Amino acid sequence: MQHYLIVWTFPTVEGSWESCPGFADYINAGGPGDSFEGFQLKYRVCEPIGGSGVAIAEATDIGKVWAHLGPWIKGYGIQFEVSAVVTDAEFASMWPGVAAVAEAE
């Protein structure tokens, strides 16, 4: 599973405000789209005044992340930036191999 950093922003404050009832309903329903085969939302925080937020997810591939974000893009026009990231432990385990390749160059 790959970790992904998801950063979102609403194009307008009005759009952010209009999404609040739907988002509250989604959270109150237990976040039904936050976990499915090949995808698990690990953490989400929102900055509701400015209409932005950040999440960390684990997914088998970027297509699973897109599937999770699709309804929010279509329904509310939210803009997302998605980056593959690693945990501290993953970084530490990868570093020796990366350093070895860098030294060989």
What annotation goes with each model-predicted range?
Residues 1-105:
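Conserved, structured core segments of small domains
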